[in-house]
Amino acid sequence: LENLRFPDGKYFEDEFFSNYLYLNSDQIHVIPDVLCYHRVLESSTMNTHKTENYLDLLDALQERIEIYFKNGYSEDETYKVLIFLLDPFTRCVKAKFCDANKQRVERSKRFIKMTAKKLMCGELPFVKKCSLVLIGLVPDWTYRVAIRFRSQLERFL
């Protein structure tokens, strides 16, 4: 783990670092206790509403999904990352970027659709597969509708 570094010039760099850490670790143990508390500064990217920053989060989460597929990680965990990816994706769609940023959002849309199709072929429960049909067709619209009915949907998913 000596050569691991947070990537330069990326927002949400901890997401990229987590991917590299996962790939370079022999074992990972989950500790279900609080080990430390942290305070988020007002100037932190965690508090930003600058949508361009979310483009890096799209890249990091897509990278994680690719890692999960490549390493045979559970489809359920991959599904969870895909669902998490829909929030920053929807923010970026609403921003209506131009040029290179617009192309990044379009690539993300194709990636989301491809991932939904792959997961539909797997062993996920029927309800999750049904949600993937909508995600595969219109990911940003699906997220906006789902977030409105989140509490009811969580009972099924």
Task: Annotate each language-model stretch with its function.
Residues 22-25, 30-31, 45-47, 54, ...:
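Gram-positive cell-envelope targeting signals
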Residues 33-41, 47-75, 88-119:
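Catalytic core of nucleotide-sugar-dependent glycosyltransferases
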Residues 74-83:
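All-alpha amphipathic helical-bundle segments outside canonical DNA-binding/catalytic cores
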Residues 27-28, 74, 125:
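A general structural signal for well-ordered secondary-structure junctions
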Residues 14, 83, 147-150:
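Amphipathic, positively biased hydrophobic alpha-helical segments used for protein targeting
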Residues 1-52:
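Conserved nucleotide-sugar donor-binding catalytic segment
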Residues 98-157:
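Membrane-interface aromatic/basic loop that binds lipid-linked glycans or pyrophosphate carriers
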